[in-house]
Amino acid sequence: MESAWSSRGTSLGSSDPQLQRFMEAEVQKQRVQLLIHHMTELCWEKCMDKPGPRLDGRAELCLVNCVERFIDTSQFILNRLEQTQKARPLFSERLSD
């Protein structure tokens, strides 16, 4: 069913640029939500030994560090991808010369 939706979405998007941008934005939102869910699960498993009525200092610090490392890593990856994409057109141009 997903492939049927994807093929319909692709054909609609190619005929309507506004619809295509909307669909891309929705897919991006879904990816962000999945990433947040995964990060929450990962940090929870790493930092929470036994849930209680309040976070103790150690668990709070662990959660903060976990989220900060996740953000740092994500930013690093995005920067690296951006550098790679900037370098790719130069490489493609050299091949066509």
Swiss-Prot record:
InterPro entries: Tim10-like, Tim10-like_dom_sf. It is a peripheral membrane protein. The keyword Protein transport applies. This is Putative mitochondrial import inner membrane translocase subunit Tim8 A-B. One of its GO terms (cellular component) is mitochondrial inner membrane. A motif (Twin CX3C motif) lies at residues 43-66. The lineage of its organism: Eukaryota, Metazoa, Chordata, Craniata, Vertebrata. One of its GO terms (molecular function) is metal ion binding. The twin CX3C motif contains 4 conserved Cys residues that form 2 disulfide bonds in the mitochondrial intermembrane space. However, during the transit of Timm8ab from cytoplasm into mitochondrion, the Cys residues probably coordinate zinc, thereby preventing folding and allowing its transfer across mitochondrial outer membrane. Belongs to the small Tim family. Disulfide bonds join C43-C66, C47-C62. Putative mitochondrial intermembrane chaperone that participates in the import and insertion of some multi-pass transmembrane proteins into the mitochondrial inner membrane. Also required for the transfer of beta-barrel precursors from the TOM complex to the sorting and assembly machinery (SAM complex) of the outer membrane. Acts as a chaperone-like protein that protects the hydrophobic precursors from aggregation and guide them through the mitochondrial intermembrane space. Its main location: mitochondrion. One of its GO terms (biological process) is protein transport. Keywords: Chaperone, Disulfide bond, Membrane, Metal-binding, Mitochondrion, Mitochondrion inner membrane, Protein transport, Translocation, Transport, Zinc. Heterohexamer; possibly composed of 3 copies of TIMM8AB and 3 copies of TIMM13. Transmembrane segments: none annotated. It is found in: Mitochondrion inner membrane.
